[in-house]
Amino acid sequence: MDKKDLFDVFDGFSQNLMETLAEAEALKKQVQDLVEQNASLRLENDKLRDRLSHFSQMEESDPSSKAISSRKENLENIYEDGFHICTFFYGQRRENNEDCAFCMELLYRE
């Protein structure tokens, strides 16, 4: 193997290392994004669980008609916080706080 061939081999090896490094950086970024998204979803989930617990306690303590209006008010608060309250997407964050026809039907039906 002459010097030129040896140089070409090292050059190819160097290029492969650079490509592998770029792929590793891309994977690292993806993992970081997923970890951030997971943390955000965990916070949302905890918040929704707290609200659900609060609603359950309210329901057990006051089953009168006042509790019904209180439940509706709580659903409105959840909806205003940017979460779906409909059966199709319950607990999911609304995209760009756009109105959901299913949620609106739940809020405003008589």
Swiss-Prot record:
Disulfide bonds: none annotated. One of its GO terms (cellular component) is nucleoid. Zn(2+) binds at residues 84, 86, 100, 103. It is found in: Cytoplasm, Nucleoid. Its cofactor is Zn(2+). Binds 1 zinc ion per subunit. Transmembrane segments: none annotated. One of its GO terms (biological process) is DNA replication. Its main location: cytoplasm. Keywords: Cytoplasm, DNA replication, DNA replication inhibitor, Metal-binding, Zinc. Homotetramer. Interacts with both DnaA and DnaN, acting as a bridge between these two proteins. HAMAP family: YabA. Belongs to the YabA family. Involved in control of chromosome replication initiation. Inhibits the cooperative binding of DnaA to the oriC region, thus negatively regulating initiation of chromosome replication. Inhibits the ability of DnaA-ATP to form a helix on DNA; does not disassemble preformed DnaA-DNA helices. Decreases the residence time of DnaA on the chromosome at its binding sites (oriC, replication forks and promoter-binding sites). Tethers DnaA to the replication machinery via the DNA polymerase beta sliding clamp subunit (dnaN). This is Replication initiation control protein YabA. It comes from Streptococcus mutans serotype c (strain ATCC 700610 / UA159). The gene is yabA.
